[in-house]
Amino acid sequence: REPDEFRAGYIPGAEHVSRGFLELKIEQVVPERDTPIIAYCAGGVRSLLAGQALKSLGYENVKSMTGGYSKWKDMGHTVQVDKQMSTEQLERYSRHFLLDQIGEKGQAKLLDAKVILVGAGGLGSPTGLYLAAMGVGTIGIIDMDVVDMSNLQRQIVHNNDRVGTSKVESAKATLSALNPDVNIISHEYRVDRTNAMEVFKDYDIIVNGADNFPTRYLVNDAAVFLGKPIVDASIFKFEGQATVFDSAGGGPCYRCLYPEPPPPGMVPSCQDAGVLGALCGTMGSIQATEVAKLIVGFGEPLV
């Protein structure tokens, strides 16, 4: 069945392969040629021809469903209809649909996901841009700083005209302009022990781009208590680190790796030591990729 037919409904558990890609993809879907296959289409004609094509490829145990999906539905059998997308969404996310690991089901998961960015700075900027571009449905941003001219070397959600304005509102304007489909929630305050649990509880994933150790430990502790995964990254001069902390999933947390913070002044900040601007883009892109992997369920997270 073709994509538009599949969107209208399908038999739960069925593998979707368009007729035009059948010969190219069948070995990925059914690697063993003695596997029983029941092919179905809308009315039973194309599936009959598809069955003949499969037999020519060595798949001998193939049958065509008489009457196809239409008859199945008319008989009252179970059907499933996924999240319906607008014409604009179908075009915007079309490159995701071509990826077997994402497809329309994966895109629907992205649209339903809620992710919060801790910081709208060097890491939060590129991560936020890619999360918005890929269609993460709800993005929260928590930061209390204002845009400074020195930020513009790396914090790409901000610009000259926004110097002196709220980073959260600047980031919201940029992400909304990139993808109006996304709901951006502003948290224009510093995350601390009085609000961390409350602000994080409504999100699926926490993206940590904090630039100080007290906040990193605070975010970690709240995530552990709430059972939320953290997609974490840090940068220093020309070096970057990225990982996923998912204690609820059986993985370690930030405190497992670093039980105690370094003594004050031992690790200089970007303000004191400097940082390569483009490095933020590299690490932020890794964070966005890890978020997508957690939401959709493809690949192995960097745990």
What are these regions (language model features)?
Residues 19, 33, 56, 74, ...:
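Adenine nucleotide-associated cytosolic modules
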Residues 3-105:
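Rhodanese-like catalytic fold shared by cysteine-dependent sulfurtransferases
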Residues 1, 41, 209-211:
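Glycine-rich, N-terminal phosphate-binding loop of Rossmann-like dinucleotide-binding domains
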Residues 1-5, 164-167:
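Short, compositionally biased "basic patch" segments
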